[in-house]
Amino acid sequence: MIVFCRLKGLTSVLYSSQGIGFEICKKLGAVGVKIIAACRNESLGVQAVAKLHALGYDVEYHNIDLSNDASIARFTNGLSEHYRSIDILVNNAGIAYKINETRSYDEQAHAILTTNFFGTMRFTEAILPLLRKAKAPRIVNVSSQGGLLKILKSETLKERFTSCSTTQQLESLVNEYLTAVYDRTYGERGWPHANYGVSKLALNALTRILAKREAATNPGKNFLINACSPGFCDTELNHHKGKRTAEYGARTPAMLALLSETGPVAPTGKFFYNDAEINW
């Protein structure tokens, strides 16, 4: 069991307005963490912050669109003007489409990868300088078991994902997938049909890459970067088909955000489900 004990004087950034993201905000706010809630839908963001304020939590809202580089720059520049450091980053951004979606498969794949992977990666890279200034920074990437390696039909692709050592290599691999989608060869090349799964697989690989990079460039920093699956929860993202509550799904992300472990045994670059590490 991992105890929530990093309580005072921490500042967290969460991409959230409802569902699991909102419940993560509640769990962090309840232990005294200042929350900077960011999301694209301003109306939902303002409503979420009002609810959190009513609970007595220290929270502020900022608008950001992860599919827009200028929006990411405005947000991170604004943070740098007002905060010396950021202690926790929870990446909870994610879009998915209904089975009867009228957009083409190409359009869906492009939109999902743009937000769930490329946008999240660029946002994380932009905010890393502030995280590095914290005493014991944490990044939590909220992923999915739908993004485990087993979704790939090609052993070569599995090996390429696990051996990626730079974000540039990973970007190239994800762009290969999009190219295969556009020319209708993704199936024969070993890619799955589930573009949401590919976006989360890429996020899991990004987690490992960033964890290794930060451990190598900032040894002794106690910078922990992990990914997790909240499980199949009853949220807007899956059209309320999940069996778990959003509150239950927020448990593991909140646990990772508040990890107190230090030293060589502290988990970083790992994937968690039900509060425990599993293979990705």
Question: Where are the regions that the model predicts?
Answer:
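Active-site Tyr-X3-Lys motif and surrounding loop/helix of classical short-chain dehydrogenase/reductase
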Residues: 74-77, 81, 97-114
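The beta1-alpha1 cofactor-binding region of Rossmann-like NAD(H)/NADP(H)-dependent oxidoreductases
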Residues: 42-43, 63-74, 106
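Conserved glycine-rich Rossmann-like NAD(P)H-binding loop of the short-chain dehydrogenase/reductase
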Residues: 31-47
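Canonical Rossmann dinucleotide-binding motif of NAD(H)/NADP(H)-dependent dehydrogenases/reductases
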Residues: 1-36
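C-terminal helical subdomain
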Residues: 227-235, 239-280
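Catalytic loop of short-chain dehydrogenase/reductase
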Residues: 95, 102-110, 132-220, 229-230, ...
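Hydrophobic positions on the long internal alpha-helix
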Residues: 90, 123-127, 131, 203-207, ...
